[in-house]
UniProtKB/Swiss-Prot annotation:
Alphabetic keyword roster: Amino-acid biosynthesis, ATP-binding, Cytoplasm, Kinase, Nucleotide-binding, Threonine biosynthesis, Transferase
Domain of life: Bacteria
Annotated positions binding ATP: 90-100
Protein name: Homoserine kinase
Listed NCBIfam families: thrB
Catalysis performed (reactions): L-homoserine + ATP = O-phospho-L-homoserine + ADP + H(+)
GO molecular function, one term: homoserine kinase activity
Signal peptide positions on this chain: none
Taxonomic source organism: Staphylococcus saprophyticus subsp. saprophyticus (strain ATCC 15305 / DSM 20229 / NCIMB 8711 / NCTC 7292 / S-41)
Family the entry assigns: Belongs to the GHMP kinase family. Homoserine kinase subfamily.
């Protein structure tokens, strides 16, 4: 009897404007991993469909590297595995593709190494690898998650907000934007005055989200001073998308993660008209309605003869 581990891992959007490196939300676009033990002397990877066709098929694969680091940490040996990989999450577009792969690697190591890590421990590991929880926390738990990673203690604490009752539109450009390039666009420091200002905006946004006051939350999202002023020049479509969204009375339009995907929050009764307007305007981008994922990673184990 052969075991097959099936993982369904959601995409994520990070920051929501001023929640830089600390706020993220899971989305119903998925990375699918089907994992079985093989009879070879090494791991193998089979990539199916777009978004994963450029990835390596050998043990230089990111998922292999992370899984082995986890195995070494817990002093277990993993069997050689075959990983079949399909993905609806485009790479290097600000939708958490690397976080989804990282989380998948942790779940693979946990299962096939029989480590018995809890979700809390998986989150700690994931954040230690990533350096911040904004993508990995919602990927693991689902929903809208706030978190803080203490680099000194290596502990991540998270909190949850009710899923916003809004529609989400993502506009995905055809080009990639590497996170490291988007990081390099940011200033090294902020003045105390700017830090206080951005903290106040972020606090107000969170309070508004808790109260389901999406007009106020959106107003705060669009006043980010942490990253969007320094990254928007890397996304030529950003201001035009923002303008069209405003014409349709959207709550907010922000850069998703490090970009270049642009995320818009809007009332459900207005979302259809807006997404069609964006599709007409941007022939080189893909605009689509997505829903918020509330479950996080789902796992299923099947036994094959």
């Amino acid at each position: 009897m052969k075991e097959a581990l099936h993982l369904k891992i959601p995409a994520s959007t990070a920051n929501l404007g001023v929640g830089f490196d600390s706020i993220g939300m899971a989305l119903n676009k998925f990375l699918y991993l089907d994992v079985t033990v093989n009879d070879e002397d090494q791991w193998s990877f089979n990539h199916i469909g777009p978004n994963v066709d450029e990835l390596p098929n050998d043990e230089s694969h990111y998922i292999y590297q992370i899984a082995q680091k986890v195995a070494e940490t817990y002093e277990v040996e993993l069997p050689n595995l075959n990983v079949e990989m399909r993905s609806e999450i485009p790479l290097a577009r600000g939708l958490g593709s690397s976080a989804s792969a990282l989380v998948g690697a942790l779940y693979i190591a946990n299962y096939f190494g029989d480590i018995e890590l809890s979700k809390y421990e998986l989150l700690q590991l994931a954040t230690d690898f990533e350096g911040h929880p904004d993508n990995v926390a919602p990927t693991i738990y689902g929903g809208l998650v706030l978190g803080y990673y203490n680099g000194d203690t290596k502990v991540t604490d998270v909190s949850y907000i009710d899923t916003p009752k809004v529609d989400i539109i993502i506009t995905i450009p055809s080009y990639k934007l590497k996170t490291i390039d988007a990081r390099n666009a940011l200033p090294d420091t902020f003045s105390h005055e700017k830090a206080v200002q951005n903290s106040a905006i972020s606090n107000t946004m969170i309070s508004a989200l808790i109260q389901h006051n999406y007009e106020l939350a959106g107003k705060m999202m669009e006043q980010d001073g942490f990253h969007e002023p320094y990254r928007q020049h890397l996304i030529p479509e950003f201001q035009t998308i923002k303008g069209i969204a405003k014409q349709h009375l959207a709550y907010a339009t922000v850069i998703s993660g490090a970009g270049p995907t642009v995320l818009t929050l809007i009332a459900p009764e207005r979302s259809g008209e807006l997404v069609r307007a964006l599709k007409r305007e941007f022939k080189d981008c893909r605009s689509e309605l997505v829903t918020i994922n509330e479950t996080g990673v789902t796992t299923k184990v099947l036994y094959q003869r």
